[in-house]
């Protein structure tokens, strides 16, 4: 059980406007990037291989392949630089952390899709 005072302080800081997702989902993370005076949106699309849940310290890691090289990026869920998270596809997984996906490419990296009716 967590400290009640800590929960009371963290509750207003949690973001509720983002889509709910879990490990094994394919997501698009829309990031706000500031370059000098300008601001633009950059999209990072990939598979969620890790999600650690702990209030305001909640983090998730997304992995994708770019030009044949595996790229991983870790995001804080409650970060103001994340403008939107889109869930593209939900997959059936039995693990909370999918680090075994780092060794797989091509057909061996496929996951079974959960179809919604």
Curated annotation (Swiss-Prot):
MF term (GO), any: structural constituent of ribosome
Keyword Protein biosynthesis: no
PROSITE patterns associated with the record: RIBOSOMAL_L19
Gene Ontology, cellular component aspect: cytosolic large ribosomal subunit
Keyword tags: Ribonucleoprotein, Ribosomal protein
GO annotation (BP), single: translation
Record-linked Pfam families: Ribosomal_L19 (PF01245)
Matches recorded under InterPro entries: Ribosomal_bL19 (IPR001857), Ribosomal_bL19_CS (IPR018257), Ribosomal_bL19_sf (IPR038657), Translation_prot_SH3-like_sf (IPR008991)
Role noted for this protein: This protein is located at the 30S-50S ribosomal subunit interface and may play a role in the structure and function of the aminoacyl-tRNA binding site.
Protein family according to the UniProt entry: Belongs to the bacterial ribosomal protein bL19 family.
Cross-referenced NCBIfam families: rplS_bact
Stated name of the protein: Large ribosomal subunit protein bL19
Source species: Mycoplasmopsis synoviae (strain 53) (Mycoplasma synoviae)
Gene this chain is encoded by: rplS
């Amino acid at each position: 059980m967590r400290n009640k005072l800590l929960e009371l302080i963290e509750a207003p800081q949690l973001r509720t406007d983002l889509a709910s997702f879990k490990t094994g989902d394919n997501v698009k993370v829309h990031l706000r990037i500031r370059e000098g005076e300008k601001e633009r949106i950059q999209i990072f699309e990939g598979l969620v291989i890790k999600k650690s849940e702990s209030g305001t310290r909640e983090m998730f890691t997304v992995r994708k392949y770019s030009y044949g090289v595996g790229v991983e990026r870790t995001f804080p869920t409650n970060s103001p630089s994340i403008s939107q998270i889109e869930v593209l596809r939900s997959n059936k997984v039995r693990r909370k952390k999918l680090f075994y996906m780092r060794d797989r490419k091509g057909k061996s990296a496929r996951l079974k899709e959960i179809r919604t009716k």
